[in-house]
Amino acid sequence: MSYEAHVTDTAYCYDGSFAGFLCCVFESYARKEIPAEVCPPEEGQLNFFGTRQIFTDEQHARRVAAGLDRLGREVKDRVTTGFLCTDPGKDLTLLRFVRLCFAQGPRAAQMLGDPDAAAAFALERAVDNEACRLIEFIRFEERDGMLGAVIHPKHRILPLLRGHFCSRLPDENFLIYDAAHGTALLHRDGQVRYLSMERYIPGADETELDWQRMWKRFFKALTIEQRRDEKAQMSHVPKRFWQDMCEMQPDLAFPAGADVRKAD
């Protein structure tokens, strides 16, 4: 295919940022080549490929970004959302898809018979699907005077959660901590920031724990033990999400003297 250019045995290594990825696209055009691999820092590099370090140049990144803007929303969303995927090899997949789009125009997003277009579509769908599911199952709790939630997603989905929660909780201060990737989405006083975090220290206070105990009792009261089907449950709520859902955790003991009524 004409958009492939010359395939080399060189791996591009870059800083892992989206701007850095756009610079890899720029370098690919400047050298009229397709790299054998595109490696962010977390993936390292394969020893049997020669390597070329691609440094982030904001001017180069802006030129490629402007080109994506001209290709339309569908193409741009596929690239930006697909970039949040953590599957190995996604960087090279997206670079090849961008080249296809520049060669074929916006219609390339619909060319799912092309392996590069199909692979980019699969990346976008994987990220979107996980974000949609987590929107339903995120559990906030009161932590250190604000709402806090911990998640362990496979992909870096925080940017896709931003619009949903900021529009529905505009007057709340909240933090969503992605423990799998060490990042957090902070909404405070109407402003949004992304933070790097190694851990989320503040724990739930006793009032919050009381609410969690009551919610767990309510959840348990609705359960019909004879009809429990864990396989069906996992088909609706993947088990990897359970660790962040209070109702799926072991029972919390009520403090001494608490007014505990049996849930029938």
PLM ranges: what are they?
Residues 173, 184-189, 199, 203-264:
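Long, compositionally biased intrinsically disordered terminal regions
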Residues 2-58:
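N-terminal ordered "arm"
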Residues 39-132:
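Charged, alpha-helical interface segments at or near domain boundaries
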Residues 78-83, 179, 228-234:
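Short coil/turn segments at secondary-structure boundaries
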Residues 10-17, 52, 115, 146-157, ...:
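Conserved aromatic-histidine-acidic binding/catalytic patches
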Residues 53-62, 191-204:
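Acidic, Ser/Thr-rich peripheral helices and adjacent loops at domain boundaries
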Residues 20-31, 95-103, 163-167, 213-220:
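Short, hydrophobic/amphipathic alpha-helical patches that form generic packing surfaces
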Residues 107-198:
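Internal, well-folded beta-alpha domain core
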